[in-house]
Amino acid sequence: MNSKVALLVVGLAVVLALVIGRQGPVAPQATNTQSQAVAAGPVAAPVAFPQPLYPQAANVAMPVEPDPAAGGGTAPATESPLPNFVPRKLKVFEGHWQGMDGRLMTEELARKLNYPRGLQGVLLGEVTLNAAFSGLLAGDLIVRIDDTPVTDMESFKAASRTVANRSDARISVLRKDNRPGAPVVRKLTVVLREAEGGLGFAQLEGAPMILAGDPRPHGYRGACTDCHPIGQGFELTPDPDLISLPPPTITRDMVARSVNPHEVRGPCEACHVIK
């Protein structure tokens, strides 16, 4: 009997030894986790990339209100946004007087518009009101107001001051002939008249404000801040002239009778709500 028990104990010991040999020694949990990490290769620590100081849609020239909901009701500490940058001295870009919209004639404009090189004066980009009634045209180059030469925007304003209280003045211009070939200009004089209150004098303006980082839409003319303030708020945005209001609601009777207040542009329901 004792020999049978002894044989049974020895058999159990052999079985346990075989099982342990196949599975290997049981390691602590921490050691097993560490060995798995080593086997899987080194794990890089997370890299904290710097976040942009201002969102892409935010304008650095305008104050950015912190979001009180962020961070459990406390706003994150950030630097103050950039204020508008307005140089004390800016180049004059254009002038307006009695319906004239003019700008300085430059070598760049002469090349673009095919004028003879070396001309000086104020080039009219648009004429309305008294300027149009006097016979001036877009493209005319003002070179003299009465007896005062005009060579740049400042002299344009100064010359207009000399006739500010008068009701008429002689405007001498160079007008380009649009025939093909080498550019040819002819000099002519028109009389600018204002029936009431005098002619007044020209008002000068600078170039419009631009956003920081705006791409340059023209050739290089020096530093942007020679002509432009940088920021936002000096121009009405969006431009109302670029906004299209939705067409009004029309009745089914108008559609049935083909009452069109405009030329045919397609089916009425393409643009209008019909009731």
UniProtKB/Swiss-Prot annotation:
Subject to proteolytic cleavage which requires both MamE and MamO. Residues 89-206 are annotated as: PDZ. Heme 2 binds at residues 268, 271-272. It is found in: Cell inner membrane. Its cofactor is heme. A motif (MCR (magnetochrome) 1) lies at residues 210-230. Keywords: Biomineralization, Cell inner membrane, Cell membrane, Heme, Iron, Membrane, Metal-binding, Oxidoreductase, Transmembrane, Transmembrane helix. It is an enzyme of class 1 (oxidoreductase). Its EC number is 1.-.-.-. Heme 1 binds at residues 224, 227-228. GO terms for molecular function: metal ion binding; oxidoreductase activity. Disruption phenotype: Cells have a weak magnetic response and make magnetosome membranes. Has fewer but larger magnetite crystals. Makes small, flaky magnetite crystals, does not alter subcellular localization of MamC, MamF, MamI or MmsF. Deletion of genes mamH to mamV (amb0961 to amb0978) gives cells with no magnetosomes and no magnetic response. Residues 21-275 are lumenal. Pfam families: MCR (PF18509). GO terms for cellular component: plasma membrane. Belongs to the magnetosome MamP family. This bacteria makes up to 20 cubo-octahedral magnetosomes of about 45 nm in diameter which contain membrane-bound crystals of magnetite (Fe(3)O(4)). This is Multi-heme protein MamP. It comes from Paramagnetospirillum magneticum (strain ATCC 700264 / AMB-1) (Magnetospirillum magneticum). The lineage of its organism: Bacteria, Pseudomonadati, Pseudomonadota, Alphaproteobacteria, Rhodospirillales. The gene is mamP.
